[in-house]
Amino acid sequence: MERAKLHIDELNKTFKISHTNKNMRKSYQFQLTMAKLGQLNDVDDVNEQMKQVAEYSDVLIDFPADVLNLTDKQKEALDEMEQDKLQELDVTLALKIQGMSNTQIADVIDSMRDSEHGDADSKSEK
């Protein structure tokens, strides 16, 4: 598998993505965490909901920091990003690790954006 690259504007740096088993496992774990967050409405306990959201916010930084071997300063730069943009970065990274093409990744990101707008539209209709 050809080594993919990922440019992060906020860090002004391009990273080579390794398709190692270790990184694959981390990408699957990240996606599992995202899926659990998607089921948050099924959790009745508000404290548990907030705990899961807080943990997810940490994962958004920890996943790319671990895979890309980021410095503390680079992690801080990611922490200053808008959450939606950081989530897109993480999804892109996970899918690049898994060998998806840029076109496939763009389709996934577009679908995420459409889903978010759909959720906002349905909430505004209430």
How would you label these PLM feature ranges?
Residues 1-54:
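Short N-terminal mixed-charge amphipathic segments
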Residues 72-126:
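C-terminal charged interaction modules
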